[in-house]
């Protein structure tokens, strides 16, 4: 018997094309992706957490826009079951709109939205300068998921659109490399800033 995500979506035809991200997007077949925090004490243990569980974890802190808590996330925090329900409904919408495996669409969206370089601050003699640096694969995946969730959450906030519809729209736009996607816009911004700081 084949293991399917939530008993519905197949893992078999899903592959990661970007060789840099291949080891950091865990697509190990699981019915319900839940690791119970087994990897949290290990360095780079995050890479072993299923990618859907990482999305669920990010959905629970959706209001944190950078260091600003523009809106609170208290209505989501700790409610993993609610996060999984959002993911299931989002994947249903993606499947209906694209006629493709939503897991495949989501993985491709992460690949498209992951920034390749960013800036860091270096201090020389009391003055600070921005310096372009390569983004590690783990951070690339983290930023892609974070930006997709932020885009969806802030796109549905105080609007008649639900979080599931907003997240589906965000993932589909990132999959299509569309500038309507907040994640793609942020990626281009980050890379442009890094290019000017070389």
UniProtKB/Swiss-Prot annotation:
Signal sequence interval, chain numbering: none
Keyword Kinase in annotation: no
Any one of the GO CC terms: small ribosomal subunit
Keywords: Ribonucleoprotein, Ribosomal protein, RNA-binding, rRNA-binding
CDD domains hit by this protein: uS7_Eukaryote
UniProt-listed GO biological process terms: translation
GO molecular function, one term: structural constituent of ribosome
Subunit structure as annotated in this protein's UniProt entry: Part of the 30S ribosomal subunit.
Function, as annotated: One of the primary rRNA binding proteins, it binds directly to 16S rRNA where it nucleates assembly of the head domain of the 30S subunit. Is located at the subunit interface close to the decoding center.
Family: Belongs to the universal ribosomal protein uS7 family.
Protein name: Small ribosomal subunit protein uS7
Gene this chain is encoded by: rps7
